[in-house]
A protein has these predicted regions:
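Hydrophobic single-pass membrane-insertion segments
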Residues: 76, 80, 94-112
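N-terminal targeting leaders characterized by basic, low-complexity, disordered sequences
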Residues: 1-75
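A surface/extracellular/periplasmic glyco- and lipid-processing/surface-interacting theme
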Residues: 71, 81-82, 118-170, 177-422
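Ser/Thr/Pro/Gly-rich low-complexity linker/stalk segments immediately outside membranes or between
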Residues: 104-126
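Hydrophobic alpha-helical targeting segments used for export or membrane insertion
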Residues: 88-94
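Short, hydrophobic alpha-helical membrane anchors of single-pass surface/secreted proteins
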Residues: 79-88
Length: 422
C-alpha cells in the first residue's frame, strides 16, 4: 500500500514573542508548557530573585531568557517541576501519536488519493504430471495420455526369465491352469521394446484388464475367455488376428516364444483407434518408510516353484521378488523385479467346468494384505462388477493409498495362506 500523499497538517503556530513567557504561579502549583523561541536558538530558563533563598522560584515574577544553557539546569528544578515537565512531554508524545494515527497514517481502506500497488505474485510451482497407472511423476505430460496396454505373460519354467516385466506399471498374478501361474502386465508410460513370452487369456485376467480400459495382447485363450473378449467389448489385440504386432524367437520352442514391442503395439493401438484409456486410478501417495514389521513375505499360491517370495529392501523401499528359490529377474536388463507395493487379494478359487482351468470369484469383496513402506496393512477389496475397478479400504473403511510405482497384485486362494515376518 502507498502512503497517503496528502500534506500533513501545518505546524502549530508559535506564539508571539511577548506571549512566549508564562509566569509560574506557585500558589496554585501549576506550570505552563515552556516553549522555545521561534528561531529555536534560545532556551527558556527561570530567573532567581534571590540565589540564597531556599526556594529559587519563590520571588520570580518573570523568567529570564539566557542565551547559554546552564549545565545544571535540571538539578536546579524541584521534584514537582520535573514531574510537570515529564507530564507535558508525555502529553506531547501521546498527542503526536494520535495525530499520526488519525491524520497522517495511510488509510488502507480508502481508495481516494492512493496509487494501487501492483505486487508480482510469486509463481506457484507447477505440479508435475503423474502417471494415472502408477502415480509416478512424468517428464513428459503426454505419457499420461497414453492408452493402457495389457499383455498376458507366461510363467512356466520354459518361459523364465521373462522380458519387460520390470517396466510394467501393475502386474496381476494368478493361476492359469494346472497350478501354473500367469501374469497380466499393464503398461502405460513405460514402453519396453522386447516383451514376452506372451500366452493365452483367461476370464479373470479380462476382469483385471477391463477397469483400466486396457487393450489386451494375447495369443488366443480359453473358450470362456474368447467369448468374454467378444461380448464384453474388450480392446482385443489377439496375435491370431494381428500377427504384424508379434514375432516368434528362435531361442525358445513354441508356445513359449511369442514376443512383441511397444513400437508394434502402439501402431496396432493407433490403427484400432485405441489412443487413450479412461479409468479410475488407484489412490497413490509418496513413500513413507516405517520401521520394518513385515520384511519377509510368502504367498502360498501353488507349489513352491510358483509361490512367490518378497524381501523388503530398506535402501530402496521396494520388495525384491523371487520364485522357486531363485531371484526373479528381467531377461533384458538382469535387474531383479522389485515392486514398490505388494498386494495379496484373497479370493475363493475353483475349477472350471472343463476340469482343467482355474476360476476365481473376483467380484464381491474379500480380505486383502497390502505390503508397503516395510509394514503390512490388512483391509478389504471390493469389486462390484466385472468392468468396475477394485476398491481397497483399510480396517476403518477408508480408501487405502498405495505408494507410487510398480504394484504387484497376487491372487491367493482362500485355502492358501499369506505369511510374513519382521
Amino acid at each position: 500500500d502507498q502512503i497517503n500523499n496528502d500534506s500533513p497538517d501545518e505546524p502549530l503556530k508559535q506564539p508571539a514573542a511577548e506571549d512566549q513567557i508564562e509566569t509560574i504561579n506557585l500558589a496554585d502549583d501549576s506550570v505552563s508548557n515552556p516553549v522555545t523561541e521561534a528561531d529555536g536558538s534560545n532556551v527558556e530558563t527561570l530567573a532567581e530573585a534571590d540565589k540564597s533563598a531556599a526556594n529559587p522560584l519563590a520571588d520570580i515574577e518573570k523568567p529570564v531568557t539566557d542565551s547559554a544553557q546552564k549545565p545544571n539546569f535540571f538539578k536546579r528544578l524541584s521534584k514537582k517541576q520535573l514531574l510537570i515537565i515529564a507530564g507535558i512531554v508525555a502529553a506531547l508524545l501521546i498527542g503526536g501519536g494520535l495525530v499520526y494515527w488519525f491524520v497522517l497514517k495511510p488509510d488502507n481502506k480508502s481508495s481516494t488519493n492512493t496509487t494501487p500497488v501492483v505486487t508480482a505474485n510469486k509463481a506457484t510451482p507447477k505440479a508435475k504430471p503423474t502417471s494415472p497407472l502408477t502415480g509416478v511423476e512424468l517428464s513428459d505430460a503426454s505419457l499420461a495420455n497414453r492408452p493402457v496396454t495389457g499383455l498376458m505373460i507366461e510363467n512356466s519354467g520354459d518361459a523364465r526369465p521373462q522380458s519387460g516385466l520390470t517396466d510394467a506399471g501393475i502386474v496381476f498374478e494368478a493361476i492359469a491352469e494346472g497350478g501354473i501361474t500367469r501374469f497380466l502386465a499393464l503398461f502405460q508410460e513405460s514402453q519396453p521394446q522386447y516383451i514376452g513370452p506372451i500366452r493365452s487369456a483367461r476370464p479373470y485376467y479380462i476382469d483385471f484388464a477391463l477397469p483400466f480400459d486396457a487393450g489386451l495382447g494375447h495369443v488366443g485363450g480359453s473358450p470362456d475367455a474368447l467369448n468374454d473378449i467378444k461380448n464384453l467389448g474388450v480392446r482385443d489385440l489377439d496375435e491370431f488376428y494381428n500377427s504384424q504386432a508379434y514375432w516368434r524367437i528362435t531361442e525358445r520352442a513354441a508356445p513359449h516364444n511369442v514376443y512383441s514391442s511397444f513400437a508394434k503395439l502402439d501402431a496396432l493401438n493407433q490403427s484400432k483407434g485405441y489412443t487413450s484409456s479412461k479409468f479410475t486410478p488407484f489412490t497413490r501417495k509418496k513413500d513413507v518408510p516405517q520401521t520394518p514389521t513385515a520384511s519377509s513375505i510368502d504367498f502360498s499360491i501353488s507349489s513352491s516353484f510358483y509361490s512367490p517370495h518378497f524381501q523388503y529392501n530398506t535402501a530402496t523401499n521396494t520388495y525384491k521378488r523371487s520364485e522357486g528359490g531363485v531371484a526373479h529377474v528381467d531377461a533384458q536388463t538382469g535387474a531383479q523385479i522389485s515392486p514398490k507395493v505388494v498386494i495379496a487379494l484373497v479370493m475363493n478359487q475353483g475349477l472350471a467346468s472343463d476340469g482343467d482351468h482355474t476360476t476365481y470369484q473376483d467380484t464381491g469383496s474379500g480380505k486383502m494384505y497390502v505390503f508397503q513402506d516395510g509394514i503390512v496393512s490388512v483391509g478389504t477389496w471390493a469389486k462390484s462388477s466385472r468392468q468396475s475397478q477394485f476398491v481397497f479400504t483399510d480396517k476403518n473403511g477408508l480408501t487405502m493409498k498405495l505408494n507410487a510405482g510398480q504394484t504387484w497384485i497376487s491372487i491367493v486362494g482362500s485355502a492358501s495362506y499369506v505369511s510374513y515376518t519382521p
